[in-house]
Amino acid sequence: MTSSSTPRHRGIFPVVPTTFADTGELDLASQKRAVDFMIDAGSDGLCILANFSEQFAITDDERDVLTRTILEHVAGRVPVIVTTSHYSTQVCAARSLRAQQLGAAMVMAMPPYHGATFRVPEAQIFEFYARVSDAIAIPIMVQDAPASGTALSAPFLARMAREIEQVAYFKIETPGAANKLRELIRLGGDAIEGPWDGEEAITLLADLHAGATGAMTGGGFPDGIRPILEAWREGRHDDAYARYQAWLPLINHENRQSGILTAKALMREGGVIASERPRHPMPELHPDTRAELLAIARRLDPLVLRWAH
């Protein structure tokens, strides 16, 4: 039996950015290089097709191409989480089964929502995750993020963990994340196999103190985040604090300034990928914001700026 003390997956699982050519098509050669860099940088696993992967700008056919291409290229080097969020229970279940068939180690799904106003009651959220669970034999990570506009209380999340077979991991990104993680672990006990930090590691130390065993971050500097997690896990808390303080300016800049385009800007600057452009209509990173990002990063000498040279 797995539990929070013996999870199947722990550590840093950064989000893989989706790479596009300047013309907007998928750039699979760059995609493979991005994956190789992220593994070389110390990622314990990867997450694909998340919000930070611009999943909302990708067609269903492209989802299949990306999932197959990345999982075949990873070839078991690290476990891969595939994001399968959708408003429809049927679509999310089908996406999740397809991810499992292609080799995913886990799926991640937000609660069903659409736009700014379409939400469903708690009973339907429970049934949504239960039906997805029934369709697959790999763990589900519930993504509790403000983007869904859906309140998921710690008691409700703990109930799903106890009563739905595959619901075992939780990425908490809401305000007061550490307190919610702490309460979730208290209420759910061993059913909470993976309490995870998210939101680009901006609350990482508080979340680790609350009991988080994993972190889903941006993909630009896993080599900076992994040693923090390792130090904390090994009881070297002063070392963890010192390392976090060193990387915090870059973590903060990603979380509050350069956002979803951070990893691609760093990867493009380091020669890992050919283009950092997002898919239209998302605007490109402002030149001043990009320059500040690189100035902060160069002080830390992350692998991303050296890997391809």
Swiss-Prot record:
<dbReference type="GO" id="GO:0008840">
    <property type="term" value="F:4-hydroxy-tetrahydrodipicolinate synthase activity"/>
</dbReference>
<dbReference type="GO" id="GO:0019570">
    <property type="term" value="P:L-arabinose catabolic process to 2-oxoglutarate"/>
</dbReference>
<dbReference type="InterPro" id="IPR013785">
    <property type="entry name" value="Aldolase_TIM"/>
</dbReference>
<dbReference type="GO" id="GO:0042803">
    <property type="term" value="F:protein homodimerization activity"/>
</dbReference>
<dbReference type="Pfam" id="PF00701">
    <property type="entry name" value="DHDPS"/>
</dbReference>
<feature type="active site" description="Schiff-base intermediate with substrate">
    <location>
        <position position="171"/>
    </location>
</feature>
<dbReference type="GO" id="GO:0005829">
    <property type="term" value="C:cytosol"/>
</dbReference>
<comment type="function">
    <text>Catalyzes the dehydration of L-2-keto-3-deoxyarabonate (L-KDA) to alpha-ketoglutaric semialdehyde (alphaKGSA). Is involved in a degradation pathway of L-arabinose that allows A.brasilense to grow on L-arabinose as a sole carbon source.</text>
</comment>
<keyword id="KW-0119">Carbohydrate metabolism</keyword>
<protein>
    <recommendedName>
        <fullName>L-2-keto-3-deoxyarabonate dehydratase</fullName>
        <ecNumber>4.2.1.43</ecNumber>
    </recommendedName>
</protein>
<comment type="subunit">
    <text>Homodimer.</text>
</comment>
<dbReference type="InterPro" id="IPR002220">
    <property type="entry name" value="DapA-like"/>
</dbReference>
<dbReference type="GO" id="GO:0047449">
    <property type="term" value="F:2-dehydro-3-deoxy-L-arabinonate dehydratase activity"/>
</dbReference>
<comment type="similarity">
    <text>Belongs to the DapA family.</text>
</comment>
<keyword id="KW-0456">Lyase</keyword>
<keyword id="KW-0054">Arabinose catabolism</keyword>
